[in-house]
């Protein structure tokens, strides 16, 4: 079992990012970017405190930059994290996470 899980919205975010990247820069770049996200997920799972706290957005949430995006996550239990959303850095975080 992976030490991280993605919410339905995070999976949708990742799918949208993959589609946009593939259309804009091609499959090879899409694969590189998705691999970088996967590596970040594992890094966060192994070091959950590495991300910056963002309690102003939601209590218990942390954020971690990945390319042009920001991964929002929270620790669940002692050895797992939940990826909440993956948002472009230009998005209105309060609006997107307030859903």
Regions found by a protein language model. Give the residues of each.
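Short proline/glycine- and basic residue-enriched helix-capping loop/turn segments at helix->loop/beta transitions
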Residues: 45-46
